[in-house]
Amino acid sequence: MTKISGIYAASMSVLNSDLSLNIEKTISHAENLIDQGCHGTAIFGSTGQAQLIPIAEKIKLLNSLSESKYKDKHLIGTGLNSLNETINFMKISFSLNFKKFLIMPPAYYKYRDEDAINFYTKIVDAVPESRIILYNFEKLCGYKFSIECIERLVQKFPNQIIGVKDSSYNLFEKLKLKNFSVMPGSESKLLKGLESGCSGIITATCNVTSQLSRKVYDDFKENKNQSCNQKLVDVRNTFDKYNLISALHTLYSKKNRIYENLLPPLSLLNKVDEKNLVQSLKNLNFETKSQLAA
C-alpha cells in the first residue's frame, strides 16, 4: 500500500469563454499550487467541476498532464456516476501512468454499505493496479461512509484502497488503520487531524491557503509552535460562508478574468457577497496576491 500525505489542493479547472476546458491554464494553475507549497493536487475533484466537464475534455487534459513537470504529484478524480465510465476513464488514465484516483460513490441513489462495497469491488476487479482514495462527502453524493465500511474495504483490498478524503468529518478523529491515509477536507481540521494521526488534507480552499496550510503542516511535523493555525482556520471559516467554488472563482477573477467562466448551474458570487468576502479576508490580514495566477 502506498499512502499519500501532506497538503493537497482540490485544484480548480480553468475554462474558456465558450466554457470549454482550457487545458494549458488548468495545468498551470495546479502547478502553481504545488510551487506555493502543496505536496500535490486533486485534478477533477468537485472543486474542479468534474461532474460538469465532458469526458473527452478530461482525457485531452490528462494527455497533456502526463507530460507535465509535476505529473507524479496529481490525484485524478473520476467525477462520474456510471460504473463503466468510471472504469474506462481509469483505464485511460492508467495508460498515461496515473495510478492514484479520488473516487466518490454514485450520487442520487439511496444505498447501503454493502452496495458501496460492491461498487468499489467492481472497480478494483477491473483496474487492480489502481490506488484509490475514497471520497466521503455525504452533502454532495448522499452517502456517508461508516468506519465499518472502510475497514471492510481495506481488509478486502489492502493494496488498492489507500486512503479517504473525509469531507463529512465523521471519520478523521476515529478511523485508525495502518498504512492508510485519512485526509480531512478542511483546513479547520488540519491540525486536529494531524494530532489524531491523519496524514494531511485535501481541500478546495488550498487554492488560496497553500502557503499557510503548508506552514501549519511543516510546523507540526517539526514540533514547532503553531503560529499560523488560527489564521488558517479563520480564513477557511470565512470561505465556508459561501459556495466554495463560487467564492474561489470570484476571488481569482479579480486578478484574471478567465476565472469568471463557470459551468452552469455554478456562478460567481453576487456583488454583496463578493464585497463581504474580500473585506473579511482583508480584516484577517490574509494576503492573496502571491497566490493568485496572473
Predicted features along the sequence, with ranges:
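Catalytic alpha/beta core domains of metabolic enzymes, predominantly
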Residues: V124-S130, F137-Y242
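Short secondary-structure capping/turn micro-motifs that flank functional sites
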Residues: Q49-A50, Y109-K110, N170, L191, ...
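Hydrophobic alpha-helix-in-membranes signature
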Residues: M104-P105, M183, P264
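C-terminal alpha-helical cap/extension of soluble enzyme domains
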Residues: K3-M12, Q36, E195-C198, I202-A294
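Short, electropositive, low-hydrophobicity segments enriched in small/polar residues
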Residues: A10, F44, Q49-L52, N81-L83, ...
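Conserved active-site and cofactor/substrate-binding residues in soluble primary-metabolism enzymes
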Residues: L21, S28, A56, K60, ...
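Surface-exposed charge patches
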Residues: E31, K91, L191, T250, ...
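Active-site beta->alpha loop and helix N-cap motifs at the rims of alpha/beta catalytic domains
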Residues: T2-K144, I150, I161
